[in-house]
Amino acid sequence: MKTLGKWLLLGLVVMSMPARAALDIVITEGVDAARPIAVIPFVWQGQGPAPQQISDVVMSDLARSGTFNPIDELGLPQRNIAKVSQFVAKEWSNVAAEAVVMGSVKPMGPDQFLVNFELVDLVKAQMQAGNGPQSSSEYLIDSSEVVISAEQFRQYGHRISDIVYEKLTGIRGAFLTRIAYVVVKHGEKSPYHLMISDYDGHNEKMLLRSPEPLMSPSWSPDGSKLAYVSFENKKAEVFVQNIYTQARAKITSYDGINGAPVFSPDGKKLALTLSRDGQPEIYVVDIDTKALKRVTNHYAIDTEASWFPDGKSLIFTSERGGRPQIYKVTLASGKVQRMTFEGEWNLGGSISPDGRSMIFVNRTNGKFNIARMDLETRFVQVLTSTRLDESPSVAPNGTMVIYGTTYQGKQVLAAVSTDGRFKARLPAGQGEVKSPSWSPFL
């Protein structure tokens, strides 16, 4: 459990190797409240089977967003069209959906495929269907055409999902993002694995393997690096590692605690917890120069720092009030302000990308759940009903939270929308999974 005073010993052997996807997403709540959308299977214009069905990726993305609910393709009146010019509005008059996604895939040469995608405004088409013949282009919201390789099918499917999501909601899609997490495979000689994958668990890669525990991965703002804690030298040390080149640098190696690193919004500094002067306190360290600035100064434990988007303030967890609560500190003045009052404990907070809300772990009646606070009204909403929830990390578009929890006696990842309506579980095929961190936009 990510609570005050818990610091796991870390050690690692640096590795980089592909691995099979170990995560799947099981939607557990919220489908009925989602907006219906039609996704027509993309028309394959080649010989033999298609390398992959891009529309399957799009359907899964939209369903996992918690915002949309793709309707059963068997109920679609036209199931073999790829362009809006083939779209017959009258045939769609009884379909309860707000838009239609369609497209085609055509082989162009060795491992080269022309992918066409179009997004149609079904509501507009239905409203105008009774007004006589209309130009089909009137219904077209967006379209694109690109040549890609078979290896790029899944990524381009995520790109289409991003376009659809943004066009219909006004919010940038987060389907082309990654998550970092720790997998624990008990019984192995080096059971602790630091992994990264696409947001949906595909394209999983191992970055680190260790005989000792790993935790607290944190993404750099450009998505190229991870900060983490290691005990490989028999003491706590903070490292920053490039996920592409594997190059890494030791950032802090003070006596005692070196923990909970998190990148500043400009990527130049880390906020972290150090006990070099006695009690665990919040510090900020310059990654290049290693210059250190102490931020808090209190006899109680201060830990789990997180940045506001403007880089001028931090939130952190402290026991200075007698129990773990979340506080805000302004870096320029050092002024500290208590943020949370509801429940028994509040800890592990992070600020949403727009700076308007805070996601954190709330303990009430002995139960640890993920909660959201509106920073203007201070209204608190408990988002989850799972058990022993911890380590929340917010998607870069602010719509979803991934977190660690316990399911059937194992540590797993789960997700919840920031309005609490949509919930999903991300079980691992092998081992236990914890300490998730959602990447920035890539």
UniProtKB/Swiss-Prot annotation:
Keywords: Cell cycle, Cell division, Periplasm, Signal
Signal peptide: 1-21
UniProt xrefs under InterPro entries: 6-blade_b-propeller_TolB-like (IPR011042), PD40 (IPR011659), Tol-Pal_TolB (IPR014167), TolB_N (IPR007195)
NAD in keyword set: no
Flavoprotein as UniProt keyword: no
Pfam entry (one): TolB_N
Parts of the chain that traverse the membrane: none
Biological processes, Gene Ontology terms: cell division; protein import
One cellular component term from this protein's GO annotations in UniProt: periplasmic space
Subcellular location: Periplasm
HAMAP family referenced in this protein's UniProt entry, alphabetically: TolB
Family label: Belongs to the TolB family.
Subunit structure: The Tol-Pal system is composed of five core proteins: the inner membrane proteins TolA, TolQ and TolR, the periplasmic protein TolB and the outer membrane protein Pal. They form a network linking the inner and outer membranes and the peptidoglycan layer.
Function summary: Part of the Tol-Pal system, which plays a role in outer membrane invagination during cell division and is important for maintaining outer membrane integrity.
Protein name: Tol-Pal system protein TolB
